[in-house]
From Swiss-Prot:
One of its GO terms (biological process) is protein retention in ER lumen. Pfam families: EXS. GO terms for cellular component: endoplasmic reticulum; membrane; trans-Golgi network. This is Protein ERD1 homolog 2. The chain crosses the membrane at residues 20-40, 92-112, 126-146, 177-197, 217-237, 252-272, 285-305, 326-346. It is a multi-pass membrane protein. The keyword Ribonucleoprotein does not apply. InterPro entries: EXS_C. Its main location: membrane. It is found in: Membrane. It comes from the Eukaryota. Belongs to the ERD1 family.
Length: 387
């Protein structure tokens, strides 16, 4: 196996931790913009009730909104919308994203200034790529005497519930479920971060080396990529078992949705490890066809779940859709874009992409498209919840 790294300038200037940081920062900005847009729409463009289109939605049980009281207790519904999107939340998101952007840009400029384009000394200054990570840790862990302290505390508690205990807050679980869903979009970035940890330990001398060369990458990188989906699966199962009478079936199906991603990740790792034993061309091995089948199944399941469950869009099976906020063609365009970007999720796990170092920025582009798709999903999901 060839260990030579092709020295593309863009690869070295935008090193791996900087690419991960860029994904996190863009996602934070888009999350804040999404919440801001939903807040404006809820305030200036209220939705007329449509009981016929919403009575069949099991998702309201998950959100702790009794269907019998949904249209009779307007005060409770208004209070729920107010708690769903608060100005303090997206203002804190803007502040958090701005601080991260400044720390990322500072580390990036210092990194380029120190290395001066010298490939030999490019990876000898790990503190600069990690500056945004240190900043994010401080913003989350250490309390600050600022106006957004409540949002900071809420984010910290949500992270602990989701990532350590695999739970969701029973009083308002939708935020914890959104956190776990967004975390799945960073599965590939989490695997890249493990590679960066190998670099810091001196096991890999270049960020652009393939992950299976050192650090048992054929096992730990797929495990790191699978962790967000494992978190989402356990969270759904825990909440479903705790609320068995109302939400067990829908949470079991949601856990199954996340579980469909695990075979794709596992088969990608196996094919990548055995790619020297067969050629991924016209004469594919049976593992490759299993990967194709699992990728199609996962993409189809998650796409249908996004449209019918998370967005509550019923066309073309219903004459009208539940939402009154936008015309039908807006939701149709959103579904089409979501389907196209769903395919890129599987494409970035394609085992053949790892055979060429020059595809590295292409894989990063796929990761950025997934962040954009998550913004689209979050917008229509919040639109469905607030309606």
């Amino acid at each position: 196996m060839d260990l030579e790294v092709v020295e593309f300038p863009l690869h070295h200037k935008l090193a791996l931790p900087f690419r991960i940081g860029l994904l996190v920062i863009v996602g934070t900005w888009l999350w804040s913009v999404c919440y801001h847009l939903i807040y404006i729409l809820n305030r200036y463009q209220p939705i007329s009730p449509n009981p016929r289109g919403s009575l069949n939605s099991k998702w309201y049980h998950l959100l702790q909104i009794p269907l019998s009281n949904r249209h009779t207790d307007l005060e409770e519904n208004t209070e729920f919308k107010a708690n769903l999107v608060s100005p303090v939340d997206f203002h804190a998101g803007y502040c958090f994203a701005a601080i991260l952007s400044i720390s990322w840009a500072t580390g990036f400029i210092l990194f380029l200034k120190k290395t001066q384009g010298d490939i030999g000394g490019l990876y000898s200054h790990p503190i600069y790529p990690l500056l945004w990570v240190i900043t994010a840790f401080i913003l989350i862990v250490f309390p600050f005497p600022w106006r957004y302290r409540s949002s900071q505390r809420g984010l910290r508690k949500s992270i602990i519930r989701v990532f350590l205990f695999f739970q969701a807050d029973f009083r308002s679980p939708y935020k914890d479920f959104i956190v776990s869903e967004i975390f799945t979009s960073y599965a590939k970035a989490l695997g890249d971060f493990y590679i960066f940890g190998c670099v810091l330990q001196g096991h890999i001398s270049k960020f652009t080396l393939r992950p299976d060369l050192k650090c048992d990458g054929t096992f730990f990188v797929p495990l790191a990529m699978a962790y967000p989906f494992i978190v989402a699966i356990l969270q759904c199962l825990h909440y479903g078992l705790s609320r068995r009478k109302h939400t067990f079936k829908i949470n079991l199906l949601s856990a199954l949705k996340h579980a469909t991603a695990l075979p794709v990740i596992y088969l990608s790792a196996i094919i990548h490890a055995k790619q020297t034993k067969f050629t991924l061309t016209s004469g594919h091995g049976y593992l490759f066809w299993l990967w194709i089948l699992s990728a199609l199944l996962s993409s189809a399941y998650t796409f249908l779940w996004d449209v019918f469950i998370d967005w509550r869009i019923r066309f073309p099976f219903h004459k009208s859709i539940n939402h009154k906020r936008f015309p039908m063609f807006i939701y149709a365009i959103g579904c089409f874009i979501n389907f196209i970007l769903r395919v890129t999720w599987s494409m970035k796990l394609h085992p053949r992409l790892h055979q060429f170092h020059e595809y590295e920025m292409g894989i990063f582009s796929f990761e950025m498209l997934e962040i954009l798709r998550r913004f689209l999903w979050l917008f229509f999901h919040l639109d469905a919840i607030s309606s």
